[in-house]
């Protein structure tokens, strides 16, 4: 039997370097990267790098040998090789100026088919929905790009079309659940087929060119190439699940015979689809008014009343109310407000929305409409205002959705300082410090207590302002009471201090009564049995003693905790010691962050309180000066 040699089995044969993979596949580095991105193959980190690299200590990029064997059977490899042949032959035709043959070759340009790869990577529709977060975020980003060297115009236009189609599904299904505004953009979370899908829509800023060292647009473009095919499949399935025509179409009532439709119907339809403000054509009219619920309430009622079932019922009822949050409300968006994110939010929750017709196509009513309930503005003032509507800032819409109720609009009026905008994506179980506003977001019953604490602060400020007046009144009252007491004492001495009864006689009468009572008690005790006598004797022995105050020494308690912690650290096994230190370091970092946040919050509250006091004093001072001026004028 032959003795096995070193590195012929085990971990050394499970991995292969990138250079060896390129030789085996006979591809260039760029083609290999493209193939790995499309197939979902990525580098691996071995457990023992020296063994995996057959004794070499050099840092190499390693792949699973099984993944490389998997790539050998991919049909795209032949298409990538055809690209190389096409480049050589077209370059030769261009060099000899054989443009006729070059035109023929360009018509036969090899194309990569990715349909089978999408089906291979996502066997079920739920698998595709689970991987939809990165897909949507990247496509929304590329939909805002202009035509670049590595990003053709057709790719950006395709990303824009697919993302608009997906937003139409979100609006029609009313599946939006959470929203948030940040520096990166607008965060959206929808619940589709029981899966939570989260994506980011970037802010609409002018495009700033990036250097090649910062962003590799070529690699990102390969991801987009795969994700466009994937999202096309997903949109097709989602639209047919709601009986919506795909590609999106409008009912005949929208396509009226006017000048715009007669000139160019395709551009008219595409503009209205991009406006996100019209209902789409349904293939089945019976399903138009029916809305599918994610949870079957009748099935839940049959399952009993366990805690889990009750929680699911409550969640289903909250979602049903949330889907009609803005029902019956009409919004008008001003020019300075971002149009598309607010249209998605308002229409996803049952509201009606419009804007200035000169900004974008698809406006359904004007600003002068008297039935408008809310106008969304982002400026300090307006020249003309209507009494029948509320002028609010855009944050009101986001906060109402996150708290699942219509909030009062007084804090969001035009020109007002907005309350803090809290993220609904924070996990309260993992975070150590939770501000009071966020607690109120997760538990609406805490809003009243938070408001009550603010009122208590105002009351304490008012008490501090009126403290001097109360002290003066108390001094006057004490002087009056002292004078009354002196008068009563003088009258008591004047009339002899008695009511005609001698004190010695009263004391003798009291002593006789006490002796009679003691004799009666002794007679009663003699008549009782021995057990009762014993109980009475024990009761007489019981007495109340003065207690002692035990002072808590915090330093000793802290020292005991530190000693216990050191004992636990010594008991940790040596192989787990690094992990233990890492956990302790993370815990200390969290505690420090919590302490800093609490300190920062205390400073902010103190500054706000001081500013409030200063404003009150200035207001009182101004009122006093105005009153003095009025007296002088009088």
Swiss-Prot record:
Pfam families: BRCT_2 (PF16589), Pescadillo_N (PF06732)
Low complexity biased stretches: 624-634
GO MF term set: ribonucleoprotein complex binding; RNA binding
UniProt domain BRCT: residue ranges: 321-414
Biased composition (Basic and acidic residues): 528-548, 603-623
UniProt keyword Coiled coil, yes or no: yes
Cellular compartments per GO CC: nucleolus; nucleoplasm; PeBoW complex; preribosome, large subunit precursor
Keywords, in A-Z order: Coiled coil, Nucleus, Phosphoprotein, Ribosome biogenesis, rRNA processing
Region (Disordered): 437-473, 491-561, 603-634
SMART domains: BRCT (SM00292)
Family classification: Belongs to the pescadillo family.
Protein name in the entry: Pescadillo homolog
Annotated source species: Drosophila willistoni
Lineage: Eukaryota, Metazoa, Ecdysozoa, Arthropoda, Hexapoda
